[in-house]
């Protein structure tokens, strides 16, 4: 049985495992391939290289799912938006400010997303039937906030000020991104993705009213649109940092799998697993420590979630300085509990 695609697993003894950023800079084999292409987005669009790095952690660790190597910002980039990735800085974007910018976004599509779908097809052909392939996109609020801020890590003052002061334009931009995100996910499913995930990295910065408008409502629209075409495809949502609003999210969004960050108590995860499959939530920093700590923290999660609808993952992505042998040890710990 494909453990991630069928996470309500008929085999309750097997805990599905995969990790966010499982293909990445902590792997020497990844760095070797990455060094061959200077521009990060060019690397994301290179069919052979992106396929190779997607498969690397599967070959090394035997995870239950591969997640396609791509980036959440390929979507605005596919509509002509200026994006550059600076070494040790992150993405730098043209800042979205006006109705003129919205008109530009609507009139400058390109065919770059076709490369993503080619990569999915190529990866799918190389995976066994027991390994799921996860396609993904950034959730509308997170993609929108990158465009409004013009950069990555930030304090979100610019984004929030914009949505408060420009309600109509903010809604137009949100709706545009929502529609295109749904289309992007549908095309990934058509190309062979078994599971789809929405990453909302910055959802936790919004107050409740804005969380409803910019996180819950667009996520719900995307899921419903995808399910019209692929009613049985499992969909994962990750409203990172949602805190107390996770429960509102579960109640209002028809998601199959809820990914949670490391700040969510295990008691909450157990409770929620009666309504939705829960994915998470080991602190990625634990993988920077030693085997004793890794084993202790992993076993605690496994014991608490035993018999529940649960997928083992981290609370966020694998950190670049993570020793690969620690990832292997964690995987062995989880497998030993089956």
UniProtKB/Swiss-Prot annotation:
Residues annotated to bind substrate: 21-25, 71, 146, 201, 316
EC code(s) of this entry: 4.1.1.37
Gene Ontology biological process terms from the UniProt entry: protoporphyrinogen IX biosynthetic process
Main location: cytoplasm
Protein localization: Cytoplasm
GO-annotated molecular function: uroporphyrinogen decarboxylase activity
CDD domains for the chain: URO-D
UniProt subunit comment: Homodimer.
Function, in words: Catalyzes the decarboxylation of four acetate groups of uroporphyrinogen-III to yield coproporphyrinogen-III.
Protein name as catalogued: Uroporphyrinogen decarboxylase
Native source organism of the sequence: Rickettsia akari (strain Hartford)
């Amino acid at each position: 049985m494909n453990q991630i695609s069928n996470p309500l697993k008929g085999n309750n003894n097997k805990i599905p495992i995969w990790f966010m950023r499982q293909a990445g800079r902590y792997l020497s084999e990844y760095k070797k391939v990455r060094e061959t292409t200077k521009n990060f987005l060019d690397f994301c669009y290179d069919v052979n290289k992106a396929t190779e790095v997607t498969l690397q952690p599967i070959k090394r660790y035997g995870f239950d799912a591969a997640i396609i190597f791509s980036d959440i910002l390929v979507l605005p980039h596919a509509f002509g938006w200026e994006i550059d990735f600076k070494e040790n800085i992150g993405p730098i974007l043209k800042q979205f400010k006006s109705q003129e910018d919205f008109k530009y976004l609507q009139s400058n599509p390109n065919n770059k997303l076709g490369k993503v779908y080619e990569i999915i097809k190529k990866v799918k052909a190389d995976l066994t039937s027991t390994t799921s392939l996860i396609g993904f996109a950034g959730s509308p609020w997170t993609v929108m906030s990158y465009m409004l801020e013009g950069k990555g890590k930030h304090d979100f003052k610019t984004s929030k000020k914009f949505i408060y002061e420009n309600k109509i334009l903010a809604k137009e931009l949100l709706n545009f991104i929502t529609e295109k995100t749904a289309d992007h996910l549908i095309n990934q499913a058509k190309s062979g993705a078994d599971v789809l995930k929405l990453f909302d990295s910055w959802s936790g910065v919004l107050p409740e009213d804005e969380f409803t408008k910019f996180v819950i409502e667009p996520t719900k629209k995307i899921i419903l649109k995808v399910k019209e075409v692929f009613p049985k495809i499992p969909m994962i949502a990750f409203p990172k940092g949602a805190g107390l609003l996770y429960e509102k999210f579960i109640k209002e969004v028809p998601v199959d799998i809820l990914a949670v960050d490391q700040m969510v108590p295990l008691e909450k995860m157990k409770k929620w697993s009666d309504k939705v499959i829960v994915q998470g939530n080991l602190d990625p920093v634990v993988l920077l420590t030693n085997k004793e700590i890794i084993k202790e923290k992993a076993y605690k999660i496994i014991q608490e979630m035993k018999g529940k609808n649960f997928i083992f993952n981290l609370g966020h992505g694998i950190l670049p300085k993570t020793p690969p042998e620690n990832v292997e040890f964690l995987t062995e710990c989880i497998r030993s509990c089956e």
